[in-house]
Amino acid sequence: MLLVLDVGNTNTVLGVFEATPAENGSYTYGRLIAHWRVGTIRTQTVDEYGVLFRNLFAMGNVDFKVIHGIIISSVVPPMDTTLRSVCERYFALKPLFVEPGVKTGMPVHYDNPSEVGADRIVNSVAAFEKYGGPCISVDFGTATTFDVVSAKGEYLGGVIAPGIGISAEALFQRTARLPRVDIKRPTKVMGTNTVNSMQSGFYWGYLGLVDGILERLVEEMGGNVKIVATGGLSPLIGAGSKYIKDVDDLLTLDGLRIIWERNQSNTRKREHGK
């Protein structure tokens, strides 16, 4: 089986894909049999992460011994060494990190391709593979990212905006009397108390940001663009958007699986020390 990890600034998502042996020592991959979302804790040790992984696998009835490959997308460089050690100590495997030099099958037309976060490339690969192009993937994470792929499968660029959670926390931290509130969709725009008014500002204001950016990106692309959203708040925001037609909670995990498949020959060489 294949273990995939998407390490974000706030959360880390793990998934396990079933695998069937194929010719030449490779595998074909099927459904996602288990996945989990945990907090990203930069101070945890290798053994603490090992215990966490064992507990998650036990909950999902997945055996450590059946994992034959690991691929990681990380936007938290200080954790990379720790995660590499976890993989080697607890799985006896060297993980494949999505980084320059890894085959993605997607040309990157960016001023400096190394600046593009691994998660953005992974999302773009999955969006194009699953939905076709041209397409835009929107990921609602700590930051909200919009990534554009051409009809030919080329990464063209995108937009990075503060996430809705950051915006809400900033308002709480910088004001004396406004409370923390849950992010939810109000029944109407006009609030009749402080909490409702804040929730309306967060939801409808952020929805305006999202749809405003998408409107302009679609216009720049000449229209007829597929748009897919992912990330923790994608169902909430996607439900109110005029432009988001598909919400795919597993987009990033599928992207990691696809990139792993495109690097199987390289990973076999690495595992055998060649």
UniProtKB/Swiss-Prot annotation:
Record HAMAP family: Pantothen_kinase_3 (MF_01274)
EC numbers for this chain: 2.7.1.33
Binding residue positions for substrate: Y110, G117, A118, D119, R120, T194
Single biological process term from Gene Ontology: coenzyme A biosynthetic process
Catalytic residues identified in the record: D119
Single GO cellular component term: cytoplasm
Catalyzed reactions: (R)-pantothenate + ATP = (R)-4'-phosphopantothenate + ADP + H(+)
Annotated binding of ATP, by residue: D6, V7, G8, N9, T10, N11, T12, V13, T142
Co-factor requirement: NH4(+); K(+)
A GO MF label: ATP binding
Pathway recorded for this protein: Cofactor biosynthesis; coenzyme A biosynthesis; CoA from (R)-pantothenate: step 1/5
Its biological purpose: Catalyzes the phosphorylation of pantothenate (Pan), the first step in CoA biosynthesis.
Species lineage: Bacteria, Pseudomonadati, Acidobacteriota, Terriglobia, Terriglobales
Record's keyword annotation contains Glycoprotein: no
Subunit-structure text: Homodimer.
Binding site for K(+): D139
UniProtKB keywords: ATP-binding, Coenzyme A biosynthesis, Cytoplasm, Kinase, Metal-binding, Nucleotide-binding, Potassium, Transferase
Domain of life: Bacteria
Family according to the record: Belongs to the type III pantothenate kinase family.
Entry-linked InterPro entries: ATPase_NBD, Type_III_PanK
Location(s) in or outside the cell: Cytoplasm
Protein's name according to its UniProt entry: Type III pantothenate kinase
Gene3D superfamilies reported for this sequence: 3.30.420.40
Cofactor binding description: A monovalent cation. Ammonium or potassium.
